[in-house]
């Protein structure tokens, strides 16, 4: 599981940073990629990665500001330029309005897609679980921005325990079909009458990863709830230390507020994005340094950077 950042800037593209989008790469887990937000130029950034558009199975939108959705019609259109056998449906999750935005854009531009879009709109005031599969659950909760906006909590379900192959061999179990039966939880009896209890050779289930991805927001309790004990928290840092008043006025957070959320939630790692174009390279290191006085495991991400989870 990896997160690759396709756009880490705030408001408008800059030479160094595109606007908001990231890919949660679940290729090893379910052979899919999930996008979170799709700002202008997202498909251009994807061309600079190994991500195949047909692998993008789900798109989660945090809110309907342009820097988070203006790349969506173009990406959906370009995704259709694949061979017919590669066409797969796509699911789009987001606040009420995302469906009308996408359909109006496609209609006005005369775009016809050879695959289906399944929309999952929700009211941000009542949203909760938005997706459950056999391996993942996704929750959303309303944040505190200038328009309806949510954050997402992606929970990987517990992973199967691992088979202790060395112990099995020591117990006289020949490598082959019996290993498979034991891994599936079946007890087996060897030719000499020895009974092998499967549970004795399988480790307990391992907890899956928890990834929290927030949209634009002021510091709020919902951010902490979404991030409790997460392995990774992706949080905006549009403003820097001392800019709390202007950040609140415009519905955003400072690096210091993001760090406090991470500390309060007990996350393992904080990744800061949605960086204002006014911050130069020398300012970025100071943003990280200031935030680290509150939460040490903090990193300011760059476009195309990939984080292994």
From Swiss-Prot:
Coiled-coil region(s): none
Catalytic reactions of this protein: Endonucleolytic cleavage of RNA, removing extra 3' nucleotides from tRNA precursor, generating 3' termini of tRNAs. A 3'-hydroxy group is left at the tRNA terminus and a 5'-phosphoryl group is left at the trailer molecule
Cofactor or coenzyme needed: Zn(2+)
Residues at the active site: 67
UniProt cross-references to InterPro entries, sorted A to Z: Metallo-B-lactamas, RibonucZ/Hydroxyglut_hydro, RNase_Z/BN
Upper classification of the organism: Bacteria, Bacillati, Bacillota, Bacilli, Lactobacillales
GO molecular function, one term: 3'-tRNA processing endoribonuclease activity
Documented EC number(s): 3.1.26.11
Keywords, sorted A to Z: Endonuclease, Hydrolase, Metal-binding, Nuclease, tRNA processing, Zinc
Role this protein plays: Zinc phosphodiesterase, which displays some tRNA 3'-processing endonuclease activity. Probably involved in tRNA maturation, by removing a 3'-trailer from precursor tRNA.
Family under the similarity heading: Belongs to the RNase Z family.
Gene: rnz
Binding partners and assembly: Homodimer.
The protein's name in its UniProt record: Ribonuclease Z
Pfam families per record: Lactamase_B
Transmembrane stretches, start-end: none
Binding site for Zn(2+) 2: 67-68, 216, 274
Cofactor info, note text: Binds 2 Zn(2+) ions.
Residues holding Zn(2+) 1: 63, 65, 145, 216
Domain of life: Bacteria
């Amino acid at each position: 599981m990896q997160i690759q950042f396709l756009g880490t800037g705030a408001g408008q593209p800059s030479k160094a940073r595109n606007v908001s989008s990231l890919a949660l790469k679940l290729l090893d887990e379910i052979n899919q990629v999930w996008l979170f937000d799709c700002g202008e130029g997202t498909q251009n950034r994807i061309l600079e990665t190994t991500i195949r558009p047909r692998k993008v199975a789900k798109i989660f939108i945090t809110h309907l500001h342009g820097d988070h959705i203006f790349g969506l019609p173009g990406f959906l259109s370009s995704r259709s330029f694949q061979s017919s056998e590669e066409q797969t449906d796509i699911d789009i999750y987001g606040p009420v309005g995302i469906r009308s935005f996408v359909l109006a854009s496609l209609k006005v531009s005369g775009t016809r897609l050879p695959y289906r879009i399944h929309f999952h709109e929700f009211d941000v005031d009542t949203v909760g679980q938005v997706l459950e599969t056999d391996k993942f659950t996704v929750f959303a909760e309303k944040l505190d921005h200038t328009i309806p906006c949510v954050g997402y909590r992606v929970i990987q379900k517990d992973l199967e325990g691992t088979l202790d192959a060395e112990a099995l061999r020591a117990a006289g179990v020949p490598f082959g079909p019996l290993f498979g039966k034991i891994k599936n939880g079946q007890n087996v009896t060897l030719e000499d009458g020895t009974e092998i209890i499967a549970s004795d050779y399988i480790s307990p289930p391992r907890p899956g990863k928890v990834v929290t991805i927030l949209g634009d927001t002021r510091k709020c309790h919902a951010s902490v709830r979404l991030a409790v004990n997460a392995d990774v928290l992706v949080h905006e840092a549009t403003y820097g230390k001392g800019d709390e008043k202007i950040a609140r006025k415009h519905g955003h957070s400072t690096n210091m507020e993001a760090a406090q959320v991470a500390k309060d939630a007990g996350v393992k790692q904080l990744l800061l994005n949605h960086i204002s174009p006014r911050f130069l390279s020398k300012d970025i290191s100071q943003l990280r340094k200031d935030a680290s006085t509150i939460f040490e495991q903090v990193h300011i991400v760059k476009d195309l950077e990939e984080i292994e989870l």
